[in-house]
């Protein structure tokens, strides 16, 4: 730090102590503090052309910090070297190439030139030897910021403090780099680059002279004085938190534990600047470092303190020097010094704070004895410990534990009197800093009493003489040290008194003591941390450094609860932002009007694609508009009942009243490559619902069901139907009564979850169809004599873009099974164009083997056709014909549970999928159930308890909610305990009609039991490979926005488990596809059916990635397999990547998949649905996926062990009786055996135990009683005790045979 002479300041030194005391190392230059722009100005980042309405989004690049770390930073930052790493993150030094450009831009402003020139000279001492004019900065990356919410809140607190505190002896937060999305996980903090810290200096071989001690301590006290004047206590002062530069400048850092003494009261009037000054750039929300002259000073004029500080930059050293210069030019400086504030015992100066502060060696006795209330003296004690460590080059009180620290303090300072001990021990008891009537806890009181008794038990010895401890120190230094290390905090010296101590004679100047004109408003710290809330708050702080990102992300901010005041933005940002908001409001109003005119529920549009760019603004190619109050952490307004419905048709309808509006919206929202066209349409008088949301829906007896032929497909332009991406975001439900049915085939290449969900595993094409159960009559009841026919439905290539974390989107899981054509998903899209066939044989195609198989319908199970994929123009490419992803009647099916958390404040959502099965049913049984009303359309209202609709779920009408895992398991068992028949959930439309929601390509779902063995093969299909029977699947993810989101998918079965960690989904991705990817990572063949087995078949990218990854992680006590980024390339660098270097540039060592993952949190609310008319969606706020999974694992092991004991006992009994070895074990659920209930059929189970390198397991070979059943080998995970007992029983069995 430099000191410049001024009139009346004779006590100031005339030379730079830093220049004289510099280390014997190369000098480093530090650029001046950045000057904030004036209101209305907006400077473009370097390399970006500025202009009215230009969106300044910097280009980034990836830089390799070390062998294991890759960062993504702006191109203006040039990597220099890695500085180090710590508990919170990694630090590296960069050169900011934009520093010289910003300095050149200050030539026209005298005040800014003054700051740039003088500050640069004073802080660097000398610029000689500097390689260039680029400013060197330190960039700190904090990865997985929200993994621990307490640590994340500390980092947020530090950001707020550093943003408002501007002082030359406090580390300067230059900026926070653009996170590129509001849903970020990592942040990059840019600060001044310092060469080392005081701890390394003390314990180095660098000689330290008394001048070094004096200069270091003086700067430390200056920075601490600024903090204490702002009523902030640091609470963690130690040498490692004091950064040192090569020219001996120091800066205090690490404000994560800092707290304000007066959190809520209004600031005193004498500290507030005039109102006319608070309106300027130095606004009231900033803490400004200024010099305050005496009141009787005249002639200040335009050189007023506030204006000088604002012109020179808040917190810069030039602010003080300009004030001095002003008084030199025309004012008589009166040498009156500031009066030292008198000590007060006011309760507002104290506060009850946590005792887990201050590193033990620097912890004052009042915290060791009475961790109730403490104040500013705690920092002065720490300064005294640091001063003693500087003098002696070792810690003075290096205690090993709590009591040893007290022992060392008493040994050096002497045992205090009983009165002093009782005073410190009783300080603050019975009062609280905000509530005087609030007392302290019994635990702290007991601890205080124990510490007091311990000190009294120590021998009463004389204190050490400081002259003996520090023989080279001066008397003034020892006197200051003695005043700092005073046992009684009330008698301890204050920071102002320390600065005026004789030890700093010749160095101290009153001008060096800046005053705080505006105290910090600590209201920002009064909140309970959650991930979404912390994300929003940190993002709002980033906006203050990069206001241009508001234009890029403005469509994502309202759903997340982020509200940016236009007045806080520069003029070049406010104007285009207002234009974008007007277009968004206009589009939302149009969607609402058209939606109401079509008879849909009144609702806020859940999403849209805006394709009309503004003049001078470059918005993203597509983004969502709308609102999602369920995930808004900051929004406290109650949800609008009128806006919580779900659009059934949305603005796709062409009505007579607003044809031009529909046409305009359709043209504006057209997506390149999309082809929203309603194929399954109904003849109505004034409207024609269509779009990618599915097929059209009609009331009973309103028209005939019409299936469009391939050549009759209209385009979006001619039918005025919006692209299906927009339709999906508004209406996830099918818009025609097209009931899917399970198909049977004699040839399916493999029985995988992809095929069960109606998806093709071919990466090159796509195909599929929704097939009606029977030819639907006017009433919606299946006709017995009609053969099944394909209901043609058009799906857009970007159909699944309309996802958001709400009930509307999660309810669409069964209807949205597509992904963008631009993504590299290994699975094909479902629901592409197909042609109507009646009475024709079923034709399937295997793209892998180029083999076609034709089969006829059996037992009325249904017929399928090959679905021809679409080109970008909506025409069929008949040359490429992938196989139809048919499902089989006896295969496991997924029972979808809705996830929504409107009534809770949870931030993520979950979809719980229940793997179920049912036996083959005759056509007559299907017709009987259809005639009984299972599939019939009925007119009901939302209040009708017989029809629990999605709308009712959103409105929170569900009752009798299970609250424990056991109740949830029981409810899941009761969900389909019959084991015979089909079920479906009904959902009501706005007009009171219902439509069966397709359950992922199957007619309905019937569960056997939660822990029942689920064979995946059909007794009549011998060629089918053994498939997977997943019992539970979890999908957790944050809000799907216009850019990307993060999610986790986990599936658990009796055979194995799969895990898709921290996947990054783009708007073109599908949540269903992610779920399929996780389930598809399970072993599929008989030889690989074990935990840890390699991925088989399906897709080359997934197979290659999983084979190279082999990553495992533990979640909820179950070992799962990381599939890496094998699903598709958009999974990003935080997924478990394949090999040493992942596709995203990151390594597997950098990836994290832990139980504390910020995305994989078990805070989603679960909805349980029961089949049939009792399909009641129930919210389970008290049940998490972790508890459900743990309960499942526990009961699974109990079931396995019970089955094994029963099998062993029967084997021994048969051996003793001379019978056969193969035994029949009844299932635990005790279901009766019948032809229609495959689950109830007894099984022949034989155990074969083998040693595993990864874990202990046993293999159970299942075979049905029928000769045509497919054997299945399943691996069961056992505990060590169970495995040893099983091994013992096996040995006993072998001995008996011998």
Swiss-Prot record:
Residues given in the record as ATP binding sites: 83-91, 140
Gene3D superfamilies: Phosphorylase Kinase, domain 1 (3.30.200.20), Transferase(Phosphotransferase) domain 1 (1.10.510.10)
Domain Protein kinase span(s) in chain numbering: 77-504
Keywords (A to Z) from UniProt: ATP-binding, Cell cycle, Cell division, Cytoplasm, Cytoskeleton, Glycoprotein, Kinase, Nucleotide-binding, Serine/threonine-protein kinase, Transferase
Main localization, broad class: cytoplasm
Activity control mechanisms: Autokinase activity is inhibited by SB505124.
Catalytic activity field: L-seryl-[protein] + ATP = O-phospho-L-seryl-[protein] + ADP + H(+); L-threonyl-[protein] + ATP = O-phospho-L-threonyl-[protein] + ADP + H(+)
Active site: 236
Glycosylation sites: 67, 296, 521, 1062
Keyword Cytoplasm in record: yes
Record GO terms (molecular function): ATP binding; MAP kinase activity
EC number: 2.7.11.24
Classification via CDD domains: STKc_MAPK
KW Kinase (keyword) present: yes
Record SUPFAM superfamilies: Protein kinase-like (PK-like) (SSF56112)
Origin superkingdom: Eukaryota
Alphabetical list of Pfam families matching this protein: Pkinase
Effect of residue 162 to Q: Results in 1NM-PP1-resistant phenotype. Reduces the inhibitory effect of 1NM-PP1 on tachyzoite cell division rates. Does not alter susceptibility to 1NM-PP1 at invasion and calcium-induced egress steps
Cell compartments where the protein resides: Cytoplasm, Cytoskeleton, Microtubule organizing center, Centrosome
Family: Belongs to the protein kinase superfamily. CMGC Ser/Thr protein kinase family. MAP kinase subfamily.
Note: Mutations in the protein confer resistance to the bumped kinase inhibitor 1NM-PP1. Treatment of parasites with 1NM-PP1 causes cell cycle arrest after S phase and parasite cell enlargement. Mutations in the protein confer resistance to the SB505124 inhibitor.
Function: Probable serine/threonine-protein kinase. Plays a role in coordinated progression of cytokinesis. Restricts duplication of centrosome core structures to one per cycle and ensures proper formation and number of new daughter parasites.
Protein name: MAPK-like protein kinase
Species whose genome carries this gene: Toxoplasma gondii (strain ATCC 50611 / Me49)
């Amino acid at each position: 730090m430099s000191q410049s002479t001024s009139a009346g300041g004779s006590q100031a030194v005339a030379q730079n102590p830093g220049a004289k005391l510099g280390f014997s190392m190369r000098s480093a230059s530090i650029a001046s503090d950045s000057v904030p722009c004036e209101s209305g100005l907006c400077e473009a980042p370097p390399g970006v052309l500025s202009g009215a309405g230009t969106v300044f989004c910097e280009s980034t690049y990836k830089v390799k910090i070390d062998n294991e770390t890759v960062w993504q930073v702006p191109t203006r930052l040039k990597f220099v070297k890695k500085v180090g790493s710590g508990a919170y993150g990694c630090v590296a030094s960069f050169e900011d190439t934009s520093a010289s450009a910003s300095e050149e831009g200050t030539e026209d402003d005298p005040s800014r030139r003054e700051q740039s020139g003088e500050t640069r000279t004073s802080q660097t001492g000398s610029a000689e030897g500097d390689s260039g004019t680029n400013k060197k900065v330190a960039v700190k990356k904090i990865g997985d910021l929200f993994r621990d919410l307490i640590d994340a809140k500390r980092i947020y607190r530090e950001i707020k403090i550093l943003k408002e505190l501007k002082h030359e002896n406090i580390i300067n937060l230059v900026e926070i780099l653009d996170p590129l999305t509001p849903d970020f996980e990592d942040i990059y903090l840019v600060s001044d680059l310092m060469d080392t810290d005081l701890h390394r200096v003390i314990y180095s071989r660098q000689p330290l002279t008394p001048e070094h001690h004096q200069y270091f301590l003086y700067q430390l006290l200056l920075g601490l004085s600024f903090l204490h004047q702002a009523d902030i206590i640091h609470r963690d002062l130690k040498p490692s938190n004091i950064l040192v530069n090569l020219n001996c400048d120091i800066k205090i850092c690490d404000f994560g534990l800092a707290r304000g003494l007066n959190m809520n009261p209004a600031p005193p009037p004498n500290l507030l600047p005039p109102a006319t000054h608070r309106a300027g750039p130095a606004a009231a929300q900033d803490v400004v470092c200024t010099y305050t002259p005496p009141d009787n000073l005249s002639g200040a004029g335009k050189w007023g303190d506030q204006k000088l500080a604002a012109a020179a930059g808040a917190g810069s050293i030039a602010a003080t020097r300009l004030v001095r210069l002003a008084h030199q030019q025309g004012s008589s400086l009166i040498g009156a010094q500031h009066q030292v504030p008198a000590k007060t015992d006011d309760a507002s100066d104290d506060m009850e704070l946590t005792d887990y502060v201050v590193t033990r060696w620097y912890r004052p006795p009042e915290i060791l004895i009475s961790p109730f209330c403490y104040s500013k003296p705690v920092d002065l004690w720490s300064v005294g410990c640091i001063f003693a460590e500087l003098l002696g080059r070792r810690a003075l009180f290096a205690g090993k534990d709590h009591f040893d620290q007290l022992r060392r303090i008493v040994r050096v300072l002497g045992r205090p009197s009983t009165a002093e001990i009782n005073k410190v021990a009783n300080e603050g008891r019975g009062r609280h800093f905000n509530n005087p009537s609030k007392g302290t806890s019994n635990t702290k009181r007991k601890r205080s009493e124990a510490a007091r008794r311990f000190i009294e038990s120590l021998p009463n010895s004389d204190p050490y003489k400081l002259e003996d401890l520090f023989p080279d120190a001066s008397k003034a230094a020892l006197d200051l040290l003695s005043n700092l290390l005073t046992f009684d905090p009330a008698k301890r010296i204050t920071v102002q008194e320390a600065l005026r101590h004789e030890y700093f004679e010749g160095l101290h100047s009153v001008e060096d003591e800046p005053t705080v004109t505006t105290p910090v408003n600590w209201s920002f710290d009064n909140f309970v941390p959650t991930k979404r809330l912390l994300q929003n708050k940190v993002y709002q702080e980033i906006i203050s450094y990069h206001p241009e990102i508001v234009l890029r992300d403005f469509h994502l901010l309202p759903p997340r609860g982020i509200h940016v005041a236009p007045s806080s933005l520069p003029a070049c940002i406010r104007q285009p932002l207002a234009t974008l908001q007007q277009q968004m409001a206009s589009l939302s109003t149009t969607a609402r009007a058209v939606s109401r005119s079509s008879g849909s529920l009144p609702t806020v549009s859940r999403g849209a694609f805006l394709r009309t760019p503004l003049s001078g603004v470059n918005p993203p190619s597509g983004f969502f508009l709308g609102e999602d109050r369920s995930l808004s952490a900051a929004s406290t307004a109650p949800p609008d009942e009128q806006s919580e419905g779900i659009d059934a048709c949305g603005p796709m309808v062409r009505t007579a009243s607003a044809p031009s509006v529909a046409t305009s919206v359709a043209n504006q929202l057209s997506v390149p490559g999309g082809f929203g066209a309603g194929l399954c349409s109904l003849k109505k008088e004034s409207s024609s619902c269509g779009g990618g949301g599915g097929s059209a829906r009609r009331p009973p007896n309103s028209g005939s069901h019409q299936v469009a032929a391939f050549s009759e497909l209209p385009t979006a332009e001619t039918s005025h139907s919006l692209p299906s991406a927009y339709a999906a975001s508004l209406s996830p439900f099918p818009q025609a009564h097209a009931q899917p049915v399970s198909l049977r085939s004699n040839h399916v290449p493999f029985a995988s979850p992809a095929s069960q969900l109606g998806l093709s595993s071919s990466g090159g094409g796509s195909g599929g169809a929704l097939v009606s159960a029977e030819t639907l009559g006017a009433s919606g009841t299946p006709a017995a004599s009609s053969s099944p026919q394909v209901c043609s439905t058009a799906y857009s290539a970007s159909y699944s873009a309309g996802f958001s974390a709400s009930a509307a989107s999660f309810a669409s899981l069964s209807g949205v099974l597509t992904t963008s054509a631009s993504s590299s998903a290994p699975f094909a899209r479902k629901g592409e164009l197909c042609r109507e066939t009646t009475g024709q044989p079923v034709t399937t195609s295997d793209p892998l083997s180029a083999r076609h198989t034709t089969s006829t319908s059996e037992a009325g199970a249904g017929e399928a056709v090959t679905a021809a994929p679409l080109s970008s123009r909506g025409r069929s490419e008949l040359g490429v014909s992938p196989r139809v992803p048919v499902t089989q009647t006896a295969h496991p099916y997924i029972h979808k549970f809705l996830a929504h958390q409107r009534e809770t404040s949870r931030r993520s959502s979950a979809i719980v999928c229940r793997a179920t099965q049912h036996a083959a049913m005759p056509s007559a049984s299907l017709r009987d159930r259809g005639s009984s009303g299972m599939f019939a359309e009925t007119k009901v209202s939302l209040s009708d308890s017989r029809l629990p609709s999605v709308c009712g779920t959103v409105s929170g009408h569900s009752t009798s909610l299970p609250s424990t895992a056991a109740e949830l398991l029981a409810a899941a068992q009761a969900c389909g305990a019959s084991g015979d028949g089909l079920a479906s959930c009904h959902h009501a439309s706005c007009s009171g009609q219902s439509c069966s929601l397709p359950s992922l390509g199957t007619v309905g779902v019937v569960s056997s039991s939660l822990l029942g063995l689920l064979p995946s093969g059909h007794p009549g299909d011998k060629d089918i490979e053994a498939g997977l029977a997943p019992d539970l699947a979890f999908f957790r993810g944050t809000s799907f926005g216009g850019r990307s989101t993060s999610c986790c998918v986990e599936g658990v079965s009796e055979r194995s488990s799969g895990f898709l960690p921290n996947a990054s989904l783009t708007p073109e991705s599908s949540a269903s596809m992610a779920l399929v990817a996780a389930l598809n990572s399970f072993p599929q063949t008989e030889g690989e059916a074990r935990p840890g087995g390699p991925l088989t078949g399906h897709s080359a990218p997934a197979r290659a990635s999983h084979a190279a990854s082999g990553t495992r992680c533990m979640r909820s006590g179950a070992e799962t397999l990381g599939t890496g980024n094998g699903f598709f390339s958009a999974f990003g660098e935080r997924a478990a990547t394949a090999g040493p270097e992942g596709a995203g540039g990151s390594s597997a060592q950098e990836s994290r998949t832990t139980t504390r993952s910020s995305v994989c949190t078990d805070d989603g609310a679960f909805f349980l649905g029961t089949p049939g008319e009792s399909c009641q969606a129930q919210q389970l706020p008290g049940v998490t996926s972790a508890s459900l999974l743990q309960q499942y694992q526990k009961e699974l092991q109990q079931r396995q062990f019970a089955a094994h004991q029963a099998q062993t006992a029967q084997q021994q009994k048969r051996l003793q009786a001379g019978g056969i070895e193969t035994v029949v074990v009844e299932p635990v659920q005790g279901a009766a055996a019948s032809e229609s209930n495959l689950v109830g059929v007894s099984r022949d189970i034989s155990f074969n135990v083998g040693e595993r390198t990864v874990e202990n397991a046993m293999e159970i070979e299942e075979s049905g009683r029928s000769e045509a059943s497919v054997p299945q080998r399943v691996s069961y995970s056992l505990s060590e005790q169970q495995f040893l007992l099983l091994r013992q029983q096996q040995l006993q069995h072998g001995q008996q045979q011998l």
